[in-house]
Amino acid sequence: MPVLHNRISNEELKARMLAETEPRTTVSFYKYFTIEDPKAFRDSLYVQFDKLKVFGRIYVAKEGINAQISVPQNKFEAFKAALFASHPALDQVRLNIALEDDGKSFWVLRLKVRERIVADGLDDESFNPANVGEYLQADRVNQMIDDPDTLFVDMRNHYEYEVGHFENAIEVPSDTFRDQLPMAVEMLQDNKDKNIVMYCTGGIRCEKASAYMLHNGFKNVYHVEGGIIEYARKAKEQGLPLKFVGKNFVFDERMGERISDDVIANCHQCGAPCDTHTNCLNDGCHLLFIQCPSCAAKFEGCCSEICREELKLPREEQRARRAGRENGIKIFNKSKGLLQTTMHIPAPEEDKDSAN
């Protein structure tokens, strides 16, 4: 019977990946379609992808598949053949190829069955996620972005918007997509007569968001086909001016792809122009924040003096201090509230008041 999960430690796998010289391609894809038996589909896909040395993160649910992976370049055609043949709905599915890629994005294959391929918190049985808005390609995006009767709505999280977004795009300030959906409806209630353009990294969130807006009475709803990744690729191929400024945050070791030369964010510690995300090196924190090279050296990769000092303690004492802390913090903390508390960054309302 084939092994259907990884048995090697993360540390060893990451070291192997960093030492690997074989060229890899980072790619993402998603598809909303009905999978009758997600567990069987997951197991079959795992066996095929494991043989091809595919690394990355893939979620499978009854509603479809969502994947961010890296594939050896010499096995890319075999990977496409396996994927396209895995289900009729995935034949010729669009693949978003990374814009900036050193092949070091992932080091292990994690293929999991989930309730949803993107956590939306929705339990309204009358909601039809297949009834989506109109796709927009790069040329239409550029045409509509300057239209006063059109609003661009960013359906990504606060830390993604902070380092890059479409010109004049509206931020829906939240830590999670599930919170953003009802928030977007509320924020845009007085704009139901306008064109609403939703966008996200690769298309999966804005596609579902467009369906949710239509479900809530909005009529003229669009979403950027393939998200920021596909828009930037097509705009460059077609020689179109880029209407996205800054960096596109990505959920792998790279943490970002440069779209334009603009640096629109600031170091969370000193305020210098910077858009480089990192996780605090203290295992008891792992706060996601923006840190410039100078502060990285000063704080030794930590988000605060407290974390820097804790990192110097003996391992056993560090473990004792971590005991009882929230489990989520140990992995990857992206909370805006904690970011503001730890880094002393004012909330948007406070910042606006101080500027007046």
Curated annotation (Swiss-Prot):
One of its GO terms (molecular function) is oxidoreductase activity, acting on paired donors, with incorporation or reduction of molecular oxygen. It is an enzyme of class 1 (oxidoreductase). GO terms for biological process: tRNA modification. Gene3D superfamilies: 3.30.70.100, Rhodanese-like domain. It comes from the Bacteria. Signal peptide: none annotated. PROSITE patterns: RHODANESE_3 (PS50206). The keyword Oxidoreductase applies. The active site is at C200. InterPro entries: Rhodanese-like_dom, Rhodanese-like_dom_sf, Rhodanese_C, TrhO, TRHO_N. Residues 146-240 form the Rhodanese domain. Its EC number is 1.14.-.-. It holds the Pfam family UPF0176_N. Keywords: Oxidoreductase, tRNA processing. It catalyses: uridine(34) in tRNA + AH2 + O2 = 5-hydroxyuridine(34) in tRNA + A + H2O. The keyword Protease does not apply. Belongs to the TrhO family. Catalyzes oxygen-dependent 5-hydroxyuridine (ho5U) modification at position 34 in tRNAs. This is tRNA uridine(34) hydroxylase. It comes from Serratia proteamaculans (strain 568).
